[in-house]
Amino acid sequence: MEHDKITPYKSDAEKKEQVAEMFDNISGKYDFLNHFFSAGIDNLWRKKAIKELAKDNPKIILDVATGTGDFAFEAMKLNPEKIIGVDISAGMLEVGRKKIEKRSLNDKMEFLLGDSEELDFDDEKFDAITVSFGVRNFQDLKKGLSELNRVLRTGGKLIILEFSKPKRFPVKQAYFTYFKYIMPVIGKVVSRDKSAYNYLPQSVMAFPEGKEFQEILKEVGFSQSKAIPLTGGIASIYVAQK
């Protein structure tokens, strides 16, 4: 099934509306489940991804699909002047804003409710854009990536951290077993949303990755890109330049 057709719930609502509802439902347990399912390795992935911006010294960063803000907070280590996070889920943003308050970062960070496919920003506003486990949830992938290209300044970088599909034994077999059979059961019990953690593996399986995804980045206007596989191909960092 095509990536755009994978949705969390069996309803007539648009994919983006279903995604917002899903993340609202699981927002209170999202951070715990994220770190639990990955055994904390997702934190290492974020650190490595943000290091790709270390030499660029970006002053204004946009974190798209910011969720509860973990990627944005990691990007704060670059000491930018401002980070703006955008997400379609009010529930996730509520959790993220509490983190901003707790860290006393109100003067440097702002989280806004918004649609990544219709960003309310001027052209070429941001020095860098980051997305962690978010592009897979875009309703229209090319439209969303085109919007990221539009608001990124010429020469700026896009950093995407996303799940991918390992190819080699035994990581491949262990990954698919865990992802398809174990994670959905635990996720359902803890989050109390029976669909959210079934949607996760389905969306990963349908998502274009590697060179196929890089071709899409090129198609929407990014001049060059590279893919960095992580932990045996469980996830990938994509670095693209406008």
Model-found features: residue ranges?
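Core SAM-dependent methyltransferase catalytic element
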Residues: 214, 220-242
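N-terminal auxiliary segments of SAM/dcSAM-dependent transferases
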Residues: 1-20
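Conserved alpha-helix/loop element of class I SAM-dependent methyltransferases that forms part
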Residues: 29-32, 39-59, 74
